[in-house]
Amino acid sequence: MVQRLTYRRRLSYNTASNKTRLSRTPGNRIVYLYTKKVGKAPKSACGVLPGRLRGVVAVRPKVLMRLSKTKKHVQQGLWWLHVRQVCPDRIKRAFLIEEQKIVVKVLKAQAQSQKAK
């Protein structure tokens, strides 16, 4: 016969805070083990590259208190790995904008030289 399972806590609904998994005890019984909620790393604030920050531990807020500062912050080297995907586009865009400014100046100079003649 199949063993029946009951929750170990008072909350009897399948909510986000009451998630469980099955576990077999040394006495060969199957019981519920309550799982922790999954943590997420902080989002990128740069606005250009979406997604979560790499190099920051993805844990729940209460666990962050116990972590050392190096695990909660991105070092400069890791930040560059995050941004380097965006930088070539920024460099190209800046170069093209400067080229466009030069073209406008040349066209203005040509127009003035045409008027002078």
Swiss-Prot record:
There is a cross-link at K108 (Glycyl lysine isopeptide (Lys-Gly) (interchain with G-Cter in SUMO2)). Component of the large ribosomal subunit. The gene is Rpl34. This is Large ribosomal subunit protein eL34. Belongs to the eukaryotic ribosomal protein eL34 family. PANTHER family: 60S RIBOSOMAL PROTEIN L34. The keyword Ligase does not apply. The keyword Transcription does not apply. The modification N6-acetyllysine is found at K36, K43. InterPro entries: Ribosomal_eL34 (IPR008195), Ribosomal_eL34_C_sf (IPR038562), Ribosomal_eL34_CS (IPR018065). It is found in: Cytoplasm, Cytosol; Cytoplasm; Endoplasmic reticulum. The modification Phosphoserine is found at S12. It comes from Rattus norvegicus. It comes from the Eukaryota. GO terms for cellular component: cytoplasm; cytosolic large ribosomal subunit; cytosolic ribosome; endoplasmic reticulum; synapse. Component of the large ribosomal subunit. The ribosome is a large ribonucleoprotein complex responsible for the synthesis of proteins in the cell. GO terms for biological process: translation. Keywords: Acetylation, Cytoplasm, Endoplasmic reticulum, Isopeptide bond, Phosphoprotein, Ribonucleoprotein, Ribosomal protein, Ubl conjugation. One of its GO terms (molecular function) is structural constituent of ribosome.
